[in-house]
Amino acid sequence: SRRQRQMCIRDRGTTLGGDDGIAVAYMLAVLDDDTLKHPALECVITTDEEIGLLGAKALDTSVLKGTHMINMDSEEEGYLWISCAGGLSGTSRIPVEYQEMEGVVTEVLIDGLNGGHSGAEIDKNRANANKLMGLFLYELGQKTAYSIKDLSGGTKDNAITRSCKATLVLGEEDLAEAKITAEKLQKDLRTEYAGSDEGITISVTTGKEETVQALSMVSKEKVVFYLVHVPFGIEKMSGEIEGLVETSSNLGILKLGKDALYSTSSVRSSVGSAKEHLSAKLQYLTEFLGGSYEEQGDYPAWEYRKDSKMRDLMADVYEELW
């Protein structure tokens, strides 16, 4: 009917939170069925999960009377959520200085990576383009002198970065070395990431000789040091649940500005203290390089409970019914 169509939220190119939609449908079906026997239920539906759990944060839990909670965030039947990582975004600002540099302006692009969601696919052994750029810059610095004019990679902290671009200033006599370094590193990385990220490409495109503003040598070394040492990937696997990533981080956003290098990492852990310790590691690294660090969007972990009568009951009932 027309009224039913008006009540439906529609869009193109998005699932509209399909997993949460299933949970809402479950709850409405139970509430709508007068034949079901169950204790008093409180069905809680919040908004804006993906952009920071804003609805959940705004919820006044004092109005709730229940003592047990069931999380219905799974998009697949037969799966029950029993734990969830907490997280935060850690933003680093590392001050840098520029000076006039004369040389051939050269663009280095690391591309072709699979990327993915840092919460769901951090265990897939996929490379992060920002981290690979740090490796390239370090390797190049072992063989020749250069400076950095620009640097950027990624737009979302929770996405494993697919590409990163650096604009360098090199002497004309060092261009060949830059291309050799790129070719060798590309070959090595495709071997290292065989089966998970074999499409990695590192391209070097030379421009014309110019006099431009580029990082001072001290600032360049700070940037490279940060990229090489900033944490990425799995920090710790769970000791209780086989195959579960307990703690991880992802360097999702990287941008060289006029006065500082800016970066944002997504930090996750299903153990609250482990999340804090990993964030502290980012803070210490940033402050060691003379920078400042800020946490944003901090939300708590839902830690695994080894003994849970409700979980065991739900598993038994599911097996009995299906």
Residue spans for each PLM region:
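Short beta-strand-to-loop capping motifs
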Residues: I110, L168-E172, S265-S269
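Alpha-helical metal-binding/catalytic segments enriched in His/Glu/Asp
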Residues: R10-E50, T106-I110, H117-L140, L251
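Single conserved hydrophobic/aromatic residue that forms the stacking wall/gate
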Residues: S1-I9
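Metal-dependent peptidase/peptidase-like ectodomains
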Residues: T61-A129, Q186-R190, S248, A260, ...
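Acidic-enriched catalytic cores of C-N bond-cleaving enzymes acting on peptides and small amides
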Residues: Q99-G103, I122-S152, E172-S248, L282-Y284
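An extended, acidic, His-containing surface patch that forms the Zn2+-binding/catalytic region
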Residues: T205-N250, K255-K258, G272-H277, S292-W322
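A structural signal for small-residue-enriched, beta-sheet-centric alpha/beta enzyme cores
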Residues: G119, K149-T161
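Acidic/histidine-rich catalytic neighborhood of metal-dependent amide-processing enzymes
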Residues: T14-M101, K149, S238-E242, E246
